[in-house]
Amino acid sequence: QEEVENFSHILNSFGRSENVLQVTKRRYSRLREASVLYYPGPDLGKLSRHRRFFGDHAWSLCGITHTTASSGAMDALVDLVTSPLREWDGLVCPSSAVKGHVLNVIEAQKEYLRREIAATKFT
């Protein structure tokens, strides 16, 4: 609860007045109230699979990737291709270099799936 209050205070210092909800794994459904889940990383695939239990329209997902060089980041980016993400979900790429690399990784994974299992449809 202290983290929520601290975060609310920070938002208020920037002139924002939105309510801040604390969502725990036991209360995942509270994300419907928030309407968007910001995750400070590119791991949106895992989060989109969790969301399926509540419906794809329950909330949107927003992630960010600052680096794409680590194996964890690369795995997360590859996972985006086959995850149940929707057009209202987004991954923030803070530079054109990061965006270019993200798009290259995603396209390489799509090409791999085309070649290996004759995949033809991607979202």
Where are these regions (language model features)?
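A short, active-site helix/loop in glycosyltransferases that binds the activated sugar's phosphate group
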Residues: A73-T123
